[in-house]
Amino acid sequence: MLELVEYLIDAYRSRIQQLEWMSEPTKQRALEKLAQFNAKIGYPEKWRSYDGLEFGEDLVENVRRGAAFEHDYQLSKIGKASDRQEWVSSPQTVNAFYNPVVNDITFPAAILQPPFFDPDADAAENFGAIGAVIGHEIGHGFDDQGSRYDGLGNLNSWWTDEDRANFEQLTAKLVGQFNGLVPSVLEGTKTKGVNGEFTLGENIGDLGGLGIAVVAYKKYLDDNGLE
């Protein structure tokens, strides 16, 4: 899995360097951010402490206590540096995540099984499955929202104005492509269809992730003398 992540990051590095619409200063900052990505795989090395949280026999009261405990926990983070070791999900979650405020990608243990990942499967299967997911999550670091955070997770405008304008001009085409699309099961209903602007980040992640997984797989083949 670590090897897959490295191949995907390397593929993104090459793709960024090849961008024709992005200026060199922004490319360098993008490469710096990419180098600062932190990958969390399987389960946390440090488990969160729930000391002080006590439960009784009243379900409603337990829910209230849990909510209050979490509220206080989140407030306690104010004014402190972000903990890059903290996980945003449990290992039992079948999903993957990009967290812009710490610039990390997370792949819980539950998603590291077929059909997404199988250590005994052919490399093509893993690059096409979990590889596309890895690419999707890395892509969130450079989409319409994640691109507004730097490599340390700070909300920081690191793009030139011209590059941002070029990005928005290009992604407007993707917004237009998805606008109004209606799933076949909803055709004939009153649904308004997809909001291309609202789903832009996910669409960038899906399309970019799959494409970059192919690039990474080709490099894997070259590195191992395969065809």
Language model region names:
Residues 1-137, 141-227:
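Intrinsically disordered, low-complexity linker/terminal regions across diverse proteins
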